[in-house]
Every structure is written in C-alpha cells, then in structure tokens.
Amino acid sequence: MHEFSLCQSVISIAKKAAENNSKKVSKIVVKIGNLAGVDIESFEFWFPVAAKDSVLEQAKLEIIHEQAIAKCKACEHEFELTRLYEQCPNCGSFEKDILKGKDMLVESIVFN
C-alpha cells in the first residue's frame, strides 16, 4: 500500500504542473532507483487507480530503473549495489557513499 501513496505524490506533482499549463498529461516518466524501497509492480498497479478522475487518467506511465552506484570510503572504488548492506568488492569495506539509485523522482511530464 506504500506504493499507492507514492503514486498520489507523483500525481500531485503532475497536477500542479498541468494547472500551470492548463493541459492534460499524456505521459509521465518516473525514475526509480533499485534502493528506493519501491515495489515497481505495485507502483504500476496503483498508478491508474490513483490517477482516476484526474488530469493523468489517460497518461502513459514510463518507469526508468536506475541502478544503484556506491563509492567505497576506504579505497574509493565505485561499484553497483543490489542491496544496501553490500561490501566493496575491491577491499571488503562496508563503508560507502551511495552516489545514485536510492531516489524516486519525476523525470518528465508530457502534456497534450
């Protein structure tokens, strides 16, 4: 059910943009990192439910999957993450900065 509230947030952003353009939304692109904690299948399921009777009701949802990338604090090696508590494959350290892949954001909105 967490994904439904995320859909509502995305729709709220698009509604505000649509009000400024006085148009309906034909497509919305959302980038979701693999560490964002979003179940993409659930998000895709809930999107049309949340968009019903809004300027996004007919909008196509496009999701861009973003692979998480981290940089090791010990050896500065950059590597892909599939889960949060992964150690550096170069030196074995667990200390890292996550460079990308932990966020969810509206990448673009296309109006009719």
UniProtKB/Swiss-Prot annotation:
Keywords: Metal-binding, Nickel, Zinc. Ni(2+) binds at H2. InterPro entries: HypA/HybF. One of its GO terms (molecular function) is nickel cation binding. Zn(2+) binds at C72, C75, C88, C91. It comes from the Bacteria. One of its GO terms (biological process) is protein maturation. Involved in the maturation of [NiFe] hydrogenases. Required for nickel insertion into the metal center of the hydrogenase. This is Hydrogenase maturation factor HypA. It comes from Francisella philomiragia subsp. philomiragia (strain ATCC 25017 / CCUG 19701 / FSC 153 / O#319-036).
